[in-house]
Amino acid sequence: MAVNVNTNVSAMTAQRYLNGASNAQQTSMERLSSGFKINSAKDDAAGLQISNRLNVQSRGLDVAVRNANDGISIAQTAEGAMNETTNILQRMRDLSLQSANGSNSKADRVAIQEEVTALNDELNRIAETTSFGGNKLLNGTFETKSFQIGADNGEAVMLSLNNMRSDNAMMGGTSYQAANGKDKDWSVQAGSNDLQITLKDTSGTDQTINISAKEGDDIEELATYINGQTDMVKASVDDEGKLQVFAGSNKVEGPVTFAGGLAGELGMQAGQAVTVDVIDVTSVGGAQESVAIVDAALQFVDSHRAQLGAFQNRFSHAISNLDNINENVSASKSRIKDTDFAKETTALTKSQILSQASSSVLAQAKQAPQAALSLLG
């Protein structure tokens, strides 16, 4: 083996391995201290890009879950208020039925009307004050809003909240009154016993209701025939013996027309819009029609509550799906970017041992040129 002074190859080799061990030791310490095995693009350029995309998706999913939970909270708030609206309407219906009873005096009905008026005021107060985050929910100003329930654009769901005030057209319908009242002595006559009621339902389909009363039937029996033929309209008789027909906005679209011999004899007039806001139970006829008006309002409220229930269930399933996606995305990101501490600790120990060994060998290699001095003796 040649003895060289100018070039110490052994020392250079030991130095190279020492540098490599030091670099590996530094990398392991960085990974262990940060918790990430990819800390810069030089560690894994492709892995860094993939993990960043997964991180963006994961954060977007977290926001989407929060958005969906906000949507559920809004729906729950509105549905809770509508539950109380339902209770109020049911009480108003009870009072209408009570007032329609013949045992009540005028003073009794006036007292009942006072409670109906107070309940109407409370119904409107609920509609005007129910809010979430400063947004009014039930007074008609919320309209339709979108809820972003996905990590990317375009993944939105629409929520509509209707006006629950008592003067909303959907909280009632149209009332058709006969011009001619019929007393207890009136009865249906042969040749003039037919009545055709033509209307269009909310799906746009034309409907015709044909009534054939029997000779000798009175006005109350005629109303019973109408109610027995369809639930699209509700018929009753007021205090003056006038037939009144109510068509709820939740079932009938547009005007109702009357034809036939009975229509001419009764003198059915043009319809008047009526809502819960204007119900009057101070008369038997008004109380009876109030029942039909409140029934239409209850169906409208219940229908909207059902929609909110479906919305909440949909969002609950959406949240479960988002959580599942986020779990898998986070797991994938972790496999790519996160440090395997068991593996990295082993690598650190290895690099530390190699560093110590390289340092020892380098020290010995530096002593090799001293042999040249001994030869010069």
Curated annotation (Swiss-Prot):
Any Pfam family the entry gives: Flagellin_N
One cellular-component annotation, GO: bacterial-type flagellum
Cell compartments where the protein resides: Secreted; Bacterial flagellum
Keyword Transmembrane helix: no
Gene3D superfamilies in the record: 3.30.70.2120, f41 fragment of flagellin, N-terminal domain (1.20.1330.10), Flagellar export chaperone, C-terminal domain (6.10.10.10)
GO molecular function: structural molecule activity
Keywords tagged on the record: Bacterial flagellum, Coiled coil, Secreted, Virulence
Residues in coiled coil: 104-128
Oligomeric form and interacting partners: Heteromer of multiple flagellin subunits including FlaA, FlaB, FlaC, FlaD and possibly FlaE.
Family under the similarity heading: Belongs to the bacterial flagellin family.
Function: Flagellin is the subunit protein which polymerizes to form the filaments of bacterial flagella. FlaD is not essential for flagellar synthesis and motility. May have a role in virulence unrelated to motility.
Entry protein name: Flagellin D
Species: Vibrio anguillarum (Listonella anguillarum)
